[in-house]
A protein has these predicted regions:
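An alpha-helical, amphipathic repeat domain used for nucleic-acid recognition
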Residues: 1-161
């Protein structure tokens, strides 16, 4: 199989095998893994290159998503699976966990605090929201124990609004 590339718009590079489009990557990735046009590449080497491209795309998407707001590990993985294969999504989540950019414990504490203090939600509702986002039950229990909402006072506050 003969590998060639074409520059796309912006920072995109299109990779072709035997003059047929296969996949798009970034100029940064291509600069790091450059192969001259016309290089003969084996099926195994091609599959490794495609996997590296997919892993980089998943990692970039994870960084982009986490730059907007916090996510639970499950929530981030689910979003990555919309555009990435499971292996690439899992690797990106693991890298974000290792780097400390993803922490379900901290996320649960912030989410519970926001829901109870700012939104005036009950502990039950906060638990449901955390479970919906894929946070482990034990982590939710600890976050709720730290917050200890007063549901009676919350109900009074809502009635008096």
């Amino acid at each position: 199989m003969r590998l060639t590339h074409q520059l796309g718009r912006g920072t995109k590079v299109h990779l072709l095998l035997d003059d047929e489009y296969q996949i798009t990557t970034s100029t940064t990735f291509w600069a790091e893994h450059y192969l001259p046009d016309g290089t003969e590449i084996s099926e195994d080497d091609w599959q490794r290159l495609v996997q590296q491209i997919n892993e980089r795309k998943a990692l970039n998407k994870a960084v982009e998503l986490l730059s907007h707001r916090d996510h639970s590990a499950k929530e981030l993985r689910d979003k990555l699976l919309r555009t990435a294969d499971p292996a690439a999504a899992d690797k990106a989540v693991a890298q974000m966990l290792d780097a400390g950019y993803l922490d379900d414990e901290k996320y649960a504490r912030r989410l519970v605090r926001h829901l109870i203090e700012d939104k005036k939600c009950s502990a039950y509702h906060a638990r449901q929201e955390c479970q919906k986002r894929g946070i482990d039950r034990e982590i939710i229990d600890r976050a709720l124990a730290e917050q200890a909402p007063d549901n009676v006072q919350t109900a009074k506050d809502l009635i008096l609004r």
